[in-house]
């Protein structure tokens, strides 16, 4: 299991990213706008750099809901491959069964 501090850090990053999402998108549109002047672009770049690092959504890590494991994460289930397999073997995930051919 992942440390509680690692899980809490990811939750904090998600909150910060959602808080600054609109501001980041507005600055990104100015930066990528071909009609914007160089001064406007440069100001937008500087403002974007002033935002907290955790405001970037790429700093978030997909983690298993149950264990907090960061690797082997399956987006469809929101869990790690290990927990998906355990729950599938117990029949706790409807419609999921072991493959056999």
Curated annotation (Swiss-Prot):
Gene Ontology, cellular component aspect = cytoplasm; small ribosomal subunit
Q: Name one GO biological process term.
A: translation
Identify a single GO molecular function assigned to this protein.
rRNA binding
Q: One Pfam family of this protein, by short name?
A: Ribosomal_S14
Keywords (alphabetical) are:
Ribonucleoprotein, Ribosomal protein, RNA-binding, rRNA-binding
- Family statement drawn from the similarity comment of this UniProt entry: Belongs to the universal ribosomal protein uS14 family.
Function statement:
Binds 16S rRNA, required for the assembly of 30S particles and may also be responsible for determining the conformation of the 16S rRNA at the A site.
- Self-association state and partner proteins as the record states: Part of the 30S ribosomal subunit. Contacts proteins S3 and S10.
Protein name from the UniProt record: Small ribosomal subunit protein uS14
Q: Which organism is it from?
A: Idiomarina loihiensis (strain ATCC BAA-735 / DSM 15497 / L2-TR)
